[in-house]
Amino acid sequence: MIDVGDLRKGDMIVYQNEMYRVIEANKHFMGRGSGLIRTRLKSVITGLIKEVSFSSGEKVEEADISFRKAQYLYNDGDHYYFMLLDTYEQYSLPAQELEDEKFYLTENLEVDLIFFNGNPVSIQLPTVVVLTVIDTEPNFKGNTVSGGGKPATLETGLKTTVPFFVERGQKIKVDTRTGDYLERA
């Protein structure tokens, strides 16, 4: 059992005898009483999204899942294909299962494939990935390092903010939890 206050985006739980992935978990505290944890849960089986509120202190059942090392191969638009590193078996996941994760997948990236009852249900990305900037504004005289940033589009379609010194074609490190620029690669 896991305390609802410890729920994070990407966690897998069992709620009302069905497995869900936590899409969002926000804590709200009232002036006096106990807090409230508002969550958005996506059913792994049906793909439907539920909004559920829990009282702080409640516990939910953690899903019995297993992780296996895999390599991302390719996607055909509808499915994303992965190969297990130990047995070379190939598995696919529907595109709708990989909401934000698809923006970090590059060919041959190693990920953890998440299995529930012997079937792949999702992936866990590494914390940091290296992506190439394909579109950003050029530098202008007067741009400073401490002066904020500029929008950039990365090779996977992810849009993020980068410092002014980053140029088109450069590789950068991106945090997969937040989508934020970390440093040049």
Curated annotation (Swiss-Prot):
Q: Where in the cell is it found?
A: Cytoplasm
Q: Which domain of life is it from?
A: Bacteria
Which is a Pfam family this sequence falls into?
A: EFP
Q: Which Gene Ontology biological process is one annotated for this entry?
A: peptide biosynthetic process
Q: InterPro entries, per this entry?
A: Elong-fact-P_C, NA-bd_OB-fold, Rib_uL2_dom2, Transl_elong_fac_P/YeiP, Transl_elong_KOW-like, Transl_elong_P/YeiP_cen, Transl_elong_P/YeiP_CS, Transl_elongation_fac_P
Biological or metabolic pathway of the protein: Protein biosynthesis; polypeptide chain elongation
Gene Ontology terms: cellular component: cytoplasm
GO MF terms here are: translation elongation factor activity
Keywords of the record: Cytoplasm, Elongation factor, Protein biosynthesis
Its biological purpose: Involved in peptide bond synthesis. Stimulates efficient translation and peptide-bond synthesis on native or reconstituted 70S ribosomes in vitro. Probably functions indirectly by altering the affinity of the ribosome for aminoacyl-tRNA, thus increasing their reactivity as acceptors for peptidyl transferase.
The record, for NCBIfam families, names:
efp, PRK00529.1
What the record says about family reads: Belongs to the elongation factor P family.
What is this protein's record name? Elongation factor P
Q: Which organism is it from?
A: Petrotoga mobilis (strain DSM 10674 / SJ95)
